[in-house]
A protein has these predicted regions:
Chain A
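Bacterial N-terminal signal peptides that target proteins for export
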Residues: 2-12
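Periplasmic c-type cytochrome electron-transfer domains
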Residues: 5-6, 23-322
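Bacterial N-terminal signal peptides
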Residues: 10-20
C-alpha cells in the first residue's frame, strides 16, 4: 500500500517537475551545447587522482606536480605566458586550462593525443615538463605506504603506470566548470543573460566565431589553421618552431600553423591567450581572431558585445565562480 | 600369483583407457562447447554498430557540408564511439582459424588505416569547411557593404561606377554558383572577376578599399577552399571504411563457417568417443555384475566352509572334552591306583606280621605239651583196676602225679603265649581292615560334599603313605591350626594330599646329608579360604620347570607318568580351589599350596 502510494507520489512529482521544467526552461537548440554533468565514477579513484594531481613525486626531481601549472583556483592554468618546466626554463607553449579538458576531442595545442591518459603520459615524461619516467614514478609512489594502500583499494594490481594514468584521468573528468550563466541560458533560463550579452551571442554567431567555437566545449572539437585570412606569424614576427603547430607532428604541409581550436569556456579568466600567449587581453585575442581568422572588421560596439558574451562563459569550480 | 598380477595389469589398462577416453571427451567438450555462435554474433553486432556509426559520421559530414548545423561535435563523437567499439572488438578473442589469422589481422590493419585516414580527412574537412562556410555566409554581407558604399555616392558617381558594381555583383553570383557547381571554368571566371575587381579597386574611392579587400579576400578563400572541401569530401567518401568493415564481416563469416565445420567435426568425435565410453562402461558393468556373482559364489562357499569348520570345531571340541574326561578318569584311576598301591603296600606290611603270628601259633601248636597228657592218660587207662596200686607202688605210677602237675603248668604257659600271639594277629587284621576300610571310604566316591575334619584327613593321607615314609626315614612335622570342620570333597582332597606327600617324599629321596622332613601346614586364610601346604627340603624346582609342572605328562621321575600334579591341579580346580607351587630354586626345597574355599560344614545342609 505504502509502496503504491510512494510510486504514485513520485509519478505525480515527476510529472509536475516535467511540466514545470517544460514551462520554465526548455533547453535551447543551439550549436553551442550546455556543459554535461560530471560522469559517475568511483569516488576513491577520483580521490586518488586528486592526490596524484597534487603530487610532486610525479616529476623527475619531486618539484612539480600537475597542480604546479594547472591552478584550479585561477582558471585551471597559470597566469604566466609560459609555465616553467622542470629545468626552470619556460615551456614553448602556453599552458591550456585543465578545466573541461576531458571534453576536448584531442589534447595539447597540436592535438597530438586523443585521450587524457596519453596526455598525462606526455606531460609526465615530456623533458620540458615533468621529465620523469614511469619506473621512477612507480618506485616513488610504491615507497609511500599511503599510496600503496590507496592504489590497492582501487586497483587489483596496485601501483602501475596505467593505474596512475587512469586515476588522474578520472580526476580530470571531474574538473568541469558548470553553472556558467551561458549554460544556464542554454538550459532554458533565458532571463539570466542581459540584453547586451544576448546581442553579443548573436554577433558571435553572425561574425562566424561559431564556425570553430561551437559544440559542448565551445571549441575543442576541431583543428584550424592559425591565420586563415592572413599571415598572423609574419605580422607578429619572431617566428619560432612551436608556431608550426601540428606540422611538427605530421610533417604535412596541410598542417602548417594548424592548432586545436581551444575551448572558450572560462576564457575570461585564462589570459594570456593563444599558443604563444601573444594576446594579453580578451580584446587583443578577439582582434586577432577577427583579423586573421574571420577576415572581418567588426564595429567597436560589436566587439564589445562579443566580449561581454564571452564573459558569460565563466563557470564555477567547487561551488565558487572562477 | 600370476593370475593376480594379470588381473592388476588388466585393471590398470582399463583405468588408463577410461582416463584417456574421459580426458579426450573433456578436451572435445571444451573444444566444441565454446559458444562460438554467440561470439560471432556479438562481434558482427559490434561491426554493424561500427558501420552504423560510420554511416552516421558520413551523414554528419554531409550535414556540415551543407551548413545545416554549426556544431561539429557530431563529427567527433562517431569516431570516439568507433574507437571504443573497436577496442571492445579487439578485446574479444573472436578469431579461430589460425591459418587465416594473418588475413584477419591484415583486414583489421586495413580498417585501422582506413579509419585513421578518414579521421584525418574529416579533421581537415572540418577546418576547411568551417572557414568556407563562414566566407560563403559572409559573402552577401560583404557585397552589401560595398553596395552600401555605392549607395552613399551621389548619382553622378554611381553612374560612373555602375560597371564596377555590376562586376562585383557578378563576381558574388559566380562565387556563390561556384560553391554549388565547382568547375575549372568558373574558377577561371572568378579569377578574371577578382582581377577585374583589383583593377576596379584602383579607380574606387578610398572608403571602398577595405570592403573590396575583404570581399576579394573571402572570394579568394572560397576559390581556394571550395575545391579543397569538395575534394576532401570525395576523398572521405572514397575512404573504404565500410568496405573494410564488410571485409571483416566476411572474414568473420568465413571463420565462423570454418569454426562450425571444426565444431561439427568435434561433435562427431565427441559422439564417437561418447559411444566408446558407453561401450566401455557397459563392459565394466558386465564385469562388475560378473564379479558380483563371483563374490556371491565365493561368499556362499566361504559360508559353507565356515559351517563345516564350525562343525569340525564342535566335533573336535567334543573330542577334546571326551579326551579330557577320559584323561580325568585315567588320572583319577591313576590316583586310585596309587592309593591302592599304597594301601596294598601297607596291607602287605601288616600281612607280614599276620603271617609271622600265624607261623608262631602253628609252631607252638605243633610242639604243644598237650601231647604228654595223652601219654599219661594211656598209663592210667592200662592200670584201670589197680589204679591205686599203680599210683602208690609202681615206679612209673609214683612219678605220674608230679608229671601231670608239670604238664598243667607247661600247658598254662603255652596257652598264654598262643593267646598273646592271636591277640597280635587279630590286631594286625584290624589294621588291615582299617586300611581297607579307609581306602573303601575314598575310592569310588564322586564329588560328594561331606563334612571333613582336615586334621583327620591329613592323618589318613599320611597313614596311606606311612610305610613309604617310615621306609625312607621321613620325619613329618604337623602344623595344624585350629580349623573347623569344612564341607568338601573328601576323595579329591585325599587324592591331592596323598600325591603331594608322595611327591615330597620322592623329592627328598636323594637327600642324604640332612634329615628328611615334610612339614604339613593347615591354616585358614581370611574367613573364606583354607590353605593347606606341603613343604619339603628336597631337590626343589628349577624356575624353567615352574610353569610346566602342572601340565599333563610332565615329570622329572624316570618311572613317573606326569599325571599326578596335573590331576591334582584339575581336582583343585574342580573344587573351586587352586594348587600352586613355590620353590626358591634347585636344592632349596619346594612348597605346594592348595587353597580351597572354606565352606563351614554347618553352613549348608
Amino acid at each position: 500500500m505504502s509502496n503504491v502510494s510512494t510510486t504514485r507520489f513520485s509519478l505525480v512529482l515527476a510529472l509536475c517537475l516535467c511540466t514545470g521544467a517544460a514551462l520554465a526552461a526548455a533547453p535551447l537548440d543551439e550549436a553551442l551545447k550546455a556543459l554535461p554533468s560530471v560522469p559517475l565514477q568511483d569516488p576513491a579513484k577520483v580521490e586518488l587522482g586528486r592526490r596524484l594531481f597534487n603530487e610532486p613525486r610525479l616529476s623527475a626531481n619531486n618539484s612539480l606536480s600537475c597542480a604546479s601549472c594547472h591552478h584550479l583556483e585561477t582558471g585551471g592554468a597559470d597566469n604566466k605566458p609560459f609555465s616553467l618546466g622542470l629545468d626552470g626554463k619556460p615551456v614553448p607553449l602556453n599552458t591550456p586550462t585543465v578545466f573541461n579538458a576531458s571534453l576536448n576531442f584531442k589534447q595539447f595545442w597540436d592535438g597530438r593525443v586523443d585521450t587524457l591518459q596519453a596526455q598525462i603520459e606526455h606531460a609526465l615524461i615530456g623533458p620540458v615538463e615533468m621529465a620523469s619516467d614511469w619506473k621512477a614514478v612507480e618506485y616513488n609512489l610504491s615507497a609511500h605506504p599511503d599510496y600503496q594502500r590507496a592504489f590497492a583499494q582501487v586497483y587489483a594490481d596496485g601501483v602501475s603506470a596505467a593505474n596512475v594514468q587512469d586515476a588522474l584521468a578520472s580526476y580530470e573528468r571531474t574538473l568541469l566548470t558548470p553553472n556558467s550563466r551561458f549554460d544556464q541560458y542554454l538550459l532554458g533560463n533565458t532571463e539570466i543573460l542581459t540584453i547586451k550579452e544576448k546581442y553579443g551571442y548573436q554577433r558571435f554567431k553572425e561574425y562566424g566565431c561559431i564556425a570553430c567555437h561551437q559544440g559542448v566545449n565551445i571549441g575543442g572539437n576541431m583543428l584550424q589553421k592559425f591565420g586563415v585570412m592572413g599571415d598572423y606569424f609574419k605580422a607578429r614576427g619572431n617566428p619560432v618552431e612551436s608556431d608550426l603547430g601540428r606540422y611538427l607532428l605530421t610533417g604535412d604541409e596541410e598542417d602548417r600553423h594548424v592548432f586545436k581550436v581551444p575551448s572558450l569556456r572560462n576564457v575570461a579568466v585564462t589570459a594570456p591567450y593563444f599558443h604563444d600567449a601573444s594576446a594579453k587581453t580578451l580584446e587583443d585575442a578577439v582582434d586577432v581572431m577577427f583579423k586573421y581568422q574571420l577576415g572581418r572588421t567588426p564595429s567597436q560596439e560589436d566587439k564589445e558585445l562579443i566580449i561581454q558574451f564571452l564573459r558569460t562563459l565563466t563557470g564555477e569550480w567547487a561551488g565558487k565562480p572562477l | 600369483m600370476r593370475r593376480f598380477s594379470r588381473r592388476r595389469a588388466s585393471q590398470m589398462l582399463l583405468g588408463l583407457i577410461a582416463l584417456l577416453l574421459a580426458s579426450t571427451l573433456v578436451f572435445l567438450y571444451l573444444k566444441s562447447s565454446r559458444d562460438q555462435t554467440a561470439t560471432y554474433t556479438q562481434s558482427r553486432d559490434l561491426i554493424r554498430q561500427l558501420q552504423q556509426l560510420n554511416a552516421q559520421w558520413d551523414s554528419e559530414v554531409l550535414k556540415a557540408r551543407i551548413a545545416i548545423t554549426h556544431n561539429y561535435d557530431p563529427l567527433v563523437t562517431p569516431l570516439s564511439d568507433m574507437t571504443r567499439i573497436w577496442s571492445e572488438l579487439q578485446d574479444r578473442d573472436t578469431y579461430h582459424n589460425p591459418a587465416d589469422l594473418p588475413g584477419w589481422q591484415a583486414s583489421q590493419a586495413a580498417y585501422v588505416a582506413a579509419i585513421q585516414e578518414k579521421a584525418r580527412l574529416v579533421d581537415q574537412f572540418k577546418s576547411h569547411n568551417a572557414v568556407l562556410r563562414n566566407s560563403l555566409a559572409f559573402l552577401p554581407t560583404a557585397e552589401d557593404d560595398i553596395q552600401a558604399q555605392f549607395n552613399q555616392i551621389d548619382d553622378q558617381g554611381r553612374l560612373q561606377l555602375q560597371g564596377v558594381a555590376t562586376d562585383t555583383y557578378d563576381l558574388l553570383l559566380s562565387s556563390l554558383e561556384f560553391a554549388q557547381v565547382t568547375s575549372d571554368e568558373r574558377a577561371a571566371d572568378i579569377l578574371v572577376g577578382l582581377g577585374k575587381l583589383a583593377i576596379n579597386k584602383e579607380s574606387l574611392p578610398s572608403e571602398f578599399q577595405a570592403p573590396v579587400d575583404i570581399l576579394s579576400n573571402h572570394i579568394s578563400l572560397i576559390l581556394r577552399e571550395q575545391p579543397l572541401v569538395n575534394s576532401l569530401l570525395e576523398r572521405i567518401a572514397a575512404v573504404p571504411v565500410a568496405e573494410r568493415l564488410d571485409d571483416l564481416t566476411t572474414h568473420l563469416n568465413q571463420d565462423q563457417q570454418n569454426a562450425d565445420l571444426v565444431d561439427h567435426q568435434y561433435h562427431r568425435y565427441l559422439l564417437i568417443f561418447s559411444t566408446l565410453l558407453v561401450v566401455l562402461l557397459l563392459y565394466l558393468a558386465v564385469r562388475l555384475l560378473r564379479s558380483f556373482a563371483e563374490i556371491n559364489r565365493v561368499n556362499r562357499a566361504l559360508q559353507s566352509a565356515n559351517e563345516t569348520l564350525e562343525q569340525r570345531v564342535e566335533r573336535r571340541t567334543q573330542q577334546l572334552k571326551d579326551a579330557q574326561s577320559e584323561l580325568l578318569d585315567s588320572a583319577r584311576q591313576a590316583g586310585m591306583a596309587e592309593i591302592a598301591t599304597n594301601v596294598l603296600h601297607n596291607v602287605g606290611n601288616v600281612l607280614n606280621s599276620v603271617n609271622i603270628s600265624a607261623e608262631l601259633v602253628s609252631r607252638k601248636l605243633r610242639g604243644s605239651k598237650a601231647l604228654g597228657l595223652g601219654k599219661a592218660m594211656q598209663l592210667i587207662n592200662a592200670h584201670q583196676g589197680d589204679l591205686g596200686t599203680f599210683l602208690t607202688d609202681d615206679e612209673k605210677g609214683k612219678l605220674l602225679p608230679g608229671y601231670l602237675n608239670q604238664l598243667v603248668e607247661a600247658i598254662a604257659v603255652e596257652q598264654q603265649g598262643m593267646s598273646d600271639e592271636l591277640a597280635q594277629l587279630s590286631k594286625s587284621i584290624d589294621h588291615i581292615k582299617d586300611i581297607v576300610s579307609t581306602q573303601q571310604s575314598y575310592a569310588g566316591a564322586a564329588t560328594l560334599l561331606e563334612p571333613i575334619n582336615i586334621g583327620a584327613l591329613m592323618d589318613d593321607a599320611l597313614r596311606m603313605n606311612a610305610g613309604a615314609l617310615s621306609r625312607h626315614h621321613v620325619t613329618v612335622v604337623k602344623e595344624y591350626a585350629q580349623v573347623p570342620q569344612i564341607l568338601g570333597d573328601k576323595h579329591r582332597l585325599l587324592l591331592i594330599m596323598v600325591n603331594l606327600i608322595s611327591n615330597a617324599k620322592y623329592a627328598m629321596s636323594n637327600l642324604s646329608e640332612r634329615p628328611r622332613q615334610i612339614t604339613l601346614k593347615v591354616e585358614a586364610q581370611g574367613e573364606d579360604t583354607l590353605k593347606i601346604s606341603v613343604k619339603d627340603d628336597g631337590e626343589g624346582i628349577p624356575p624353567e620347570n615352574m610353569t610346566r609342572i602342572f601340565t599333563h605328562g610332565f615329570t622329572t621321575r624316570k618311572e613317573g607318568h606326569g599325571f599326578g600334579l596335573h590331576s591334582c591341579a584339575l581336582a583343585a580346580v574342580q573344587m573351586h580351589g587352586q594348587l600352586s607351587a613355590h620353590s626358591d630354586g634347585p636344592g632349596l626345597g619346594a612348597v605346594f599350596t592348595l587353597t580351597i574355599p572354606l565352606t563351614l560344614a554347618g553352613s549348608s545342609s
